[in-house]
Design a protein with these regions (language model features):
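TRAFAC-class small GTPase G-domain
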Residues: 1-234, 244
Length: 244
């Protein structure tokens, strides 16, 4: 008997620091894919407020439904992310590519952080949950020469270290590419993301990709959804979909 694809549902979680543009991204995805009643006003994805808790939307595609969870990125909310890991089929991690501080050479960030944390990694025996909380203590708004990319790196590493996301496809979106002060996606990929994924604390080989987007303007959003769509199908043996 053939499976009714309209009943196939995959869960995706949107993660990233506060003000990265996750809620705007979800609004843009909804505007692209969710049918609107006749006469309904055109959505304005630019009018959003910071997420406290979660937003959720079911996105109908031709061969599946994507249930997308937008989880708050404030420090106080990040400890709750782990409760979504076991049931998710993909992770979208949103990076604010315009928040790089005064020094755009983000490749220096990795070497500086590596030298300062090399000793502590071997002395900690904490669980991933404890490590996640400890690494985020004292990390706040942008104030360093690197803006919040250092904070972003630590948070992304914490996500990757959790055993519950092993094998889960991860899409990193370099958001706010419409801004003149943004960092190009290739620099985020080479200077930050690749070092995290392939570094000592990363998980080595992983199904992942880095794409540029402007959640505000909608550019790159469809490509992001299509990548997630293809990868959750490819990984359906490892993480089967939910049948609704």
């Amino acid at each position: 008997m053939e499976t009714d694809i309209s009943q196939t549902e995959y869960s995706v979680i949107l993660l990233g620091l506060d003000n990265a543009g996750k809620t705007t991204l979800l609004s843009q995805i909804k505007a692209l894919y969710q049918p609107r009643p006749e006469g309904a006003p055109t959505p304005n994805p630019g009018k959003t407020v910071p997420t406290v808790g979660q937003n959720v939307a079911t996105i109908p595609l031709h061969d599946m439904n994507l249930k997308i969870w937008d989880v708050g990125g404030q420090i106080s909310m990040r400890g709750l992310w782990q409760s979504y890991y076991t049931s998710c089929h993909a992770i979208i991690f949103v990076v604010d590519s315009a928040d790089v501080g005064q020094d755009p050479d983000i490749t220096r960030l990795i070497s500086r952080r590596a030298s300062s944390t090399a000793g502590t990694r071997n002395t900690r025996g904490n669980s991933s949950a404890e490590a996640f909380s400890e690494e985020n203590v004292g990390i706040g708004a942008a104030s360093s020469e690197f803006g919040r990319l250092d904070e972003c790196r630590q948070v992304l590493e914490s996500v990757l270290q959790n055993a519950d996301v092993a094998g889960v496809p991860i899409l990193v979106l370099a958001n706010k590419q419409d801004r003149e002060d943004c960092v190009e996606v290739v620099r985020i990929k080479e200077g930050l993301v690749r070092k995290v994924f392939e570094g000592e604390t990363g998980s080595g080989v992983r199904d992942s990709r880095v794409l540029p987007v402007s959640a505000l303007l909608g550019s790159g959003v469809q490509a992001a959804v299509e990548w997630v769509q293809s990868r959750v199908k490819w990984n359906k043996e490892g993480r089967p979909p939910v049948m609704r």
